[in-house]
């Protein structure tokens, strides 16, 4: 016999999956058809789920949809299992189609594999940070020179975090400028604006968004209520990159990632 917890979880999962698939509320009769649980029993669990703030109704006469909190928990659980899996993208047009079909904003930028190889002193006038494929140039200061020596062997993201922590503003700005030059692809900027509905949306348009991601999955306060963003490690046209995917919590990111993997 199915336990009440199992039934409740099963009903909630069915509501989530149906909404992701059809973007439409689901009622007790449809759940009964999908799950073979009596409609009267389903109504009891719908009341419990509603009381717990896990589902809601857009209108009194309509079916149920998952709440924003439910979707946040759903994507958190999903991403814990998926975030370390490899993603390969072989053409830009495929990303453009995905952005349009799923109404997501997409930003692809390089620099993931950049590691500080050497710190050079140019006549005590400039300091050159050599990342092998890229370089940064700073004004020479003895204190900065000594500090930067300790960063040799670290990747660009780690150096950026340290620079932010110690308020090394010149270095932070140089890294931001470098990241701008490393943008490989961007699509659906209109969606970026829709997420914020104000001038805040510009932070999604450049690589400074990278440092706002404390984790690879972010909700509020980085994104407005009801929206989210994923920062994905990937290969894009053979280059190590990060990809930002941003959109509604009701967007099917599971399907998006599946499409990407199938196209690889």
Swiss-Prot record:
KW Transcription (keyword) present: yes
Chain's gene name: hrcA
Keywords linked to the UniProt accession: Repressor, Stress response, Transcription, Transcription regulation
Known function: Negative regulator of class I heat shock genes (grpE-dnaK-dnaJ and groELS operons). Prevents heat-shock induction of these operons.
Protein name: Heat-inducible transcription repressor HrcA
Keyword Transcription regulation attached: yes
Molecular-function annotations in GO: DNA binding
PANTHER family from the UniProt entry: HEAT-INDUCIBLE TRANSCRIPTION REPRESSOR HRCA (PTHR34824:SF1)
GO biological process, one term: negative regulation of DNA-templated transcription
Family recorded in the similarity comment: Belongs to the HrcA family.
């Amino acid at each position: 016999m199915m336990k009440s917890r199992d039934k409740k979880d099963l009903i909630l999962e069915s509501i989530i999956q149906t909404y992701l698939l059809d973007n439409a509320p689901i009622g007790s009769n449809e759940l009964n058809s999908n799950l073979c649980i009596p409609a009267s029993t389903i109504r009891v669990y719908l009341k419990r789920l509603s009381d717990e703030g896990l589902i809601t109704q857009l209108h009194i006469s309509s079916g149920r949809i998952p709440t924003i909190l439910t979707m946040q928990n759903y994507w958190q659980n999903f991403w814990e299992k998926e975030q370390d899996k490899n993603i390969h993208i072989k053409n830009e047009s495929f990303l453009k189609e995905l952005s349009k079909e799923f109404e997501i904003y997409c930003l692809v930028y390089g620099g993931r594999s950049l590691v500080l190889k050497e710190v050079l002193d140019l006549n005590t006038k400039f300091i050159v940070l050599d990342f092998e494929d890229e370089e940064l140039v700073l004004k020479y200061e003895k204190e900065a020179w000594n500090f930067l020596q300790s960063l040799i062997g670290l990747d660009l993201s780690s150096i950026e975090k340290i620079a932010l922590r110690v308020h090394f503003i010149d270095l932070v700005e140089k890294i931001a400028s470098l990241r701008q030059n490393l943008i490989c692809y961007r699509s659906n900027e209109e969606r970026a604006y829709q997420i914020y509905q104000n001038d805040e949306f510009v932070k999604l348009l450049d690589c400074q968004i990278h440092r706002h991601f404390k984790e690879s999955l972010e909700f509020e306060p980085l994104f407005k209520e009801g929206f989210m963003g994923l920062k994905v490690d990937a290969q894009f046209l053979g280059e190590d990159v990060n990809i930002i995917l941003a959109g509604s919590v009701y967007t099917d990111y599971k399907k998006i990632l599946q499409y990407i993997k199938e196209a690889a």
